[in-house]
Amino acid sequence: MSLNLPGYALFFILLVASSGAKPAPDLQILEPPLSSLEEQEEMQEEVQEKVQEQQEEVQEKVQEQQEEVQEQQEEVQEQQEEQQEEVQERGRGTGDVLLRAQLDSSTWALQKDDVLMRLFKDLLRTSKRSRSRYKKGGLRSCFGVRLARIGSFSGLGC
């Protein structure tokens, strides 16, 4: 390995020139690090003041939101009370509560009768052909009556 110093120098110069890096013209522009305790204490006080201001702002926002929520809850309660009063007035004026209980029991008996009637009508509507498919607990097999023998012989029966 031979050292090619002029080649490396030329590469470095081209690299710096292409990147556009320039040395700082005035080193006094850069601020020196905080060296005194007084400056550090001043910075801490400023930070604490900003934190307190932000906390106060957050507390104010929280209080405003709580007040809004309370107002909304009160409105909802008022609406519920109004609705309950309306329902009570309707129920008291006509005596519907007793009639509803009586109708519910009688409609239940009518519903039972309707269900049985529908079942019998459905059974009467079915054709004899479809009724013959069902024997002692349903279809003979998943293939039907004619294909039951073929399915059982082939091993494909259900």
Curated annotation (Swiss-Prot):
Keywords: Cleavage on pair of basic residues, Disulfide bond, Hormone, Secreted, Signal, Vasoactive
InterPro entries in UniProt: C_natriurtcpep, Natr_peptide, Natr_peptide_CS
GO molecular function, one term: hormone activity
Example GO biological process: cGMP biosynthetic process
Keyword Ribonucleoprotein among UniProt keywords: no
Compositionally biased region (Basic and acidic residues): 47-64
Residue numbers covered by the propeptide annotation in the UniProt entry: 22-136
Disulfide bonds: 142-158
Stretches of the chain forming a coiled coil according to its record: none
Region span, Disordered: 32-95
Residue spans of biased composition, Acidic residues class: 65-86
Gene Ontology CC terms, in alphabetical order: extracellular region
Signal peptide residues on this chain, from the entry's feature table: 1-21
Localization per record: Secreted
One Pfam family it belongs to: ANP
Protein role: Exhibits natriuretic and vasodepressant activity. Has cGMP-stimulating activity. May help to regulate body fluid homeostasis in a variety of aquatic environments.
Family stated for the protein in its record: Belongs to the natriuretic peptide family.
Name of the protein in question: C-type natriuretic peptide 3
